[in-house]
Amino acid sequence: MAARMCCQLDPARDVLCLRPVGAESRGRPVSGPFGPLPSPSSSAVPADHGAHLSLRGLPVCAFSSAGPCALRFTSARRMETTVNAHQVLPKVLYKRTLGLSAMSTTDLEAYFKDCLFKDWEELGEEIRLMIFVLGGCRHKLVCSPAPCNFFTSA
């Protein structure tokens, strides 16, 4: 069961943020299956994070009341589809972290809104629908995921 989220551009930081639908303008803490997630000052993921796949490898901003930076996230399902093949999303996001020209913010916002969130809401959480950290925000990881070669493999 997925929470309803919306993408909002934060012009001050030039990032897209995920916010719960109906949240206050400053956002609100995200709740997990074990209750509210830790505060931004927390330095580690809860010890029982293994029971909930989506808590693995979350950046510090995931626990912020302003919400996580959406540019860090995509789903395994979308990585496998031909819809994403021509956009090569991981490379696009990596280029943005380097300050290089890439997909526009408007296009990225549409991608997350129309593709990813639709999948999450319709299909719910499953093992194949894991969250991968791809880059695009400068927040330090709370817990590093297993190494991946998204940026070097095509």
From Swiss-Prot:
The gene is X. Multifunctional protein that plays a role in silencing host antiviral defenses and promoting viral transcription. Does not seem to be essential for HBV infection. May be directly involved in development of cirrhosis and liver cancer (hepatocellular carcinoma). Most of cytosolic activities involve modulation of cytosolic calcium. The effect on apoptosis is controversial depending on the cell types in which the studies have been conducted. May induce apoptosis by localizing in mitochondria and causing loss of mitochondrial membrane potential. GO terms for biological process: DNA-templated transcription; symbiont-mediated activation of host NF-kappaB cascade; symbiont-mediated arrest of host cell cycle during G2/M transition; viral genome replication. Keywords: Activation of host NF-kappa-B by virus, Activator, Apoptosis, Host cytoplasm, Host G2/M cell cycle arrest by virus, Host mitochondrion, Host nucleus, Host-virus interaction, Modulation of host cell cycle by virus, Transcription, Transcription regulation. InterPro entries: Transactivation_prot_X (IPR000236). Belongs to the orthohepadnavirus protein X family. May form homodimer. May interact with host CEBPA, CFLAR, CREB1, DDB1, E4F1, HBXIP, HSPD1/HSP60, NFKBIA, POLR2E and SMAD4. Interacts with host SMC5-SMC6 complex and induces its degradation. Interacts with host TRPC4AP; leading to prevent ubiquitination of TRPC4AP. Interacts with host PLSCR1; this interaction promotes ubiquitination and degradation of HBx and impairs HBx-mediated cell proliferation. Its main location: host cell. It is found in: Host cytoplasm; Host nucleus; Host mitochondrion. One of its GO terms (cellular component) is host cell nucleus. This is Protein X. A fraction may be phosphorylated in insect cells and HepG2 cells, a human hepatoblastoma cell line. Phosphorylated in vitro by host protein kinase C or mitogen-activated protein kinase. N-acetylated in insect cells. The keyword Coiled coil does not apply. Residues 68-117 are annotated as: Mitochondrial targeting sequence. It comes from Hepatitis B virus genotype C subtype ar (isolate Japan/S-207/1988).
